[in-house]
């Protein structure tokens, strides 16, 4: 599984979505947040763990 770093423009929250593709990650982010950024950055497992953001 790959890690995608998002921010939500409405709440200002940063969060991570685990998904195999960027397109799937965007769809998951839209399920949980009103206005997630549409171009997330891929991050490593280590980076995701160290950031400590909520993961979906």
Regions picked out by a protein language model, each given a short descriptive name:
Residues 8, 18-19, 45:
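Surface-exposed beta-strand edges and flanking loops
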Residues 12-23, 55:
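Short, low-complexity, intrinsically disordered N-terminal segments
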Residues 18-35:
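Short, flexible N-terminal segments of the mature chain
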Residues 31-56:
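Short, mixed-charge low-complexity intrinsically disordered segments
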Residues 3-5, 19, 39:
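Residue-level detector of functional hotspots within protein domains
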Residues 1-13:
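Short aromatic-glycine-(Arg/Gly/Cys) micro-motifs in beta-strand/loop hairpins
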């Amino acid at each position: 599984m790959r890690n995608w770093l998002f921010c939500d423009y409405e709440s200002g929250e940063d969060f991570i979505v685990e998904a195999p593709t960027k397109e799937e990650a965007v769809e998951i982010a839209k399920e949980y947040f009103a206005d997630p950024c549409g171009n997330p950055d891929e991050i490593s497992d280590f980076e995701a763990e160290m950031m400590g953001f909520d993961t979906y």
